[in-house]
């Protein structure tokens, strides 16, 4: 939290398409394997693809039980059997948790949260009853303030209408990272609000100097570290390169919200 020194202070320079190239991307921490039920690559295939793309860190964040067809909780309990470095890539094994209600409660249980290397959370229509913009914002703020939630996935995808300024300010205060999600911006997803929502998030993060994490949300190995739908938005708002963490693995690890004592 702010008092513990987690409020982020970052110097600002501006995004330039010539400064950050795909080969400079060193981490992607929102991906899924076949364990999520509707993805198409194995864990080893995902890590191998990450190594081929030159990544230093890969996060594999399987869907939590609120999503039909995903793995059962025992999957997360057994993550200890997986090496945390493969093909030269550091692995962060975790979950994409589901925001369940207007208070920001998430699924799984604390017993499992503690076993994860990384914890992201988002709103998914399959397990969230859409409310008013105030109710949805309350849900998101509750998740941002949750001590175990480190990253908010696809806040701009339009699944729920949100007030973004309080969300960005809460992220800054708590050290919770906001994701700009490439998959949400893919035209084949037909998420009509995603473009404008993500532009607003980026403008607010620029205004308040809040770092963001780009997420591929890859459900197949070919999509790892694929941010092609995000780059035009970064250029449109002249987003500061120093606030993008995907080419800064050590800074990312420093800024990742620590677990409760």
Feature map (PLM): residue ranges:
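Histidine/acidic-residue-rich catalytic or RNA/ligand-binding cores of hydrolases
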Residues: 37-41, 70-71, 161-168, 188-202, ...
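Short acidic/histidine-rich active-site segments
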Residues: 63, 210-224
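His/Asp/Glu-enriched short active-site or ligand-binding loop at hydrolase and phosphoryl-transfer sites
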Residues: 177-190
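Active-site mouth loops of central-metabolism enzymes
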Residues: 29-43, 98, 124-132
């Amino acid at each position: 939290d702010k008092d513990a020194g987690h409020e982020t202070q970052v110097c600002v320079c501006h995004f330039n398409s010539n400064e950050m190239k795909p080969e400079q991307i060193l981490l992607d921490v929102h991906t899924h394997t076949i364990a999520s039920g509707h993805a198409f690559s194995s864990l080893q295939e995902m890590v191998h693809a990450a190594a081929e793309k030159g990544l230093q860190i890969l996060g594999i964040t399987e869907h939590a039980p609120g999503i039909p067809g995903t793995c059962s909780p025992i999957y997360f309990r057994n993550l200890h059997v997986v090496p945390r470095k493969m093909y030269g890539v550091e692995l962060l094994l975790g979950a994409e948790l589901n925001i369940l209600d207007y208070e920001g409660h998430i699924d799984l249980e604390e017993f499992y949260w503690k076993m994860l290397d990384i914890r992201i959370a988002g709103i998914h229509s399959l397990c969230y009853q859409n409310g008013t913009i105030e109710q949805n914002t309350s849900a998101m703020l509750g998740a941002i303030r949750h001590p175990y939630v480190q990253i908010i996935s696809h806040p701009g995808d339009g699944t729920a209408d949100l007030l973004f300024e309080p969300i960005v300010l809460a992220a800054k205060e708590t050290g919770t990272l906001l994701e700009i999600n490439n998959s949400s911006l893919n035209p084949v997803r037909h998420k009509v609000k995603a473009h404008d929502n993500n532009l607003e998030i980026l403008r607010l993060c620029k205004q308040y100097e809040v770092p963001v994490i780009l997420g591929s949300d890859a459900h197949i190995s070919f999509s790892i570290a694929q941010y092609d739908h995000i780059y035009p938005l970064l250029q449109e708002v002249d987003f500061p390169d120093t606030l993008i963490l995907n080419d800064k693995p050590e800074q990312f690890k420093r800024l990742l919200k620590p677990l409760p004592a």
